[in-house]
Amino acid sequence: MIPFLGVLFDGFAYGMLLFLLSVGLSVTLGMMNFVNLAHCSFAMIGAYVTITATQTLGIPFLATLPLAFLAAAIVSVVLERVLFQRFYRATDLDQCLLTIGIVFVSIAVVAYLYGTTLQSIKVPAYLQGSFNVGGVTMGIYRLFLIAIALDVAVALVVGIEKTRFGARIRAAVDNQRMARGLGIDVDRTFALTFALGSGLAGLGGALAIQMVGLDNDFAFRYLIYVLIVVSVGGLGSIGGSFAAAVLLGVSDVAGKYYAPQFGAFFIYAVMIVLLMWRPQGLFGRR
């Protein structure tokens, strides 16, 4: 029983990381109907900003987290203004080709600037180590990541469902012409939404370094996981992304722990079963 609880805790922590990496794509894809396969490139931007800030500039780890968010958000706004907004009415294939091209560019830039070796980071002493609760070993850093992910989930639900900005997003998505007629700056709203989603990816990338490491293939490797979470959770659903991330994170960790020879396939098996049951996702609309 104790090993199972430990696996459950580690799986939940991994699920929270997947949630941070994927929820921004769920928002932009579900609400703006834009297929952004470059989403994990923004996560990689946040991660390498954290690496540079801590190792080169000597900035404390916690102080780099908002920097990672801002860096990814700023780059995304520039790309949204210059490139992405021109493709909002394009076909899904055109959007995929554009954004996957950006992934290749980001990988090449990172390889040129940082090389292809695995990067690591040293977190503060107070985030290292672990402690036992009822015989279950809990890593302090994992608890820290879980706390941040839960705060982000609550803030997103409240922000999108209960605030004026959230109402503007929903109005702009439902009917752009009507929203413009009501005085809503749709272009600005979309840019801010894109910045929010990409900034969260940057934050997730910064937090991912300690758990899963970082190299120039990060944007491709975790794009698959992010797309799985968004598909299983349902487009545009924050609650769906949260539930899917937890379920898939626990499944992935448990599969690799109990059946390491087949562990890498568990997350795909769970995805197939869930999408056969609910093709629109757990919280998606038909």
Q: PLM features: residue spans?
A:
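Helix-loop-helix "hairpin" substructures at the membrane interface of multi-pass membrane proteins
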Residues: Y14, T137-L214, I238-A244
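Alpha-helical transmembrane segments within multi-pass membrane transporters and channels
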Residues: G58-V103, V109, A243-L248, R278-P279
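Hydrophobic alpha-helical transmembrane segments of polytopic membrane proteins
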Residues: L20, A72, Y225-V250, A269-L275
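Short, non-helical or kinked segments that cap or interrupt transmembrane helices
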Residues: L25-A47, F61, R89-Q95, F165-R168, ...
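Inter-helical junctions in multi-pass inner-membrane proteins, predominant
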Residues: I2-L17, G159-R164, F190-V232, D252-A264
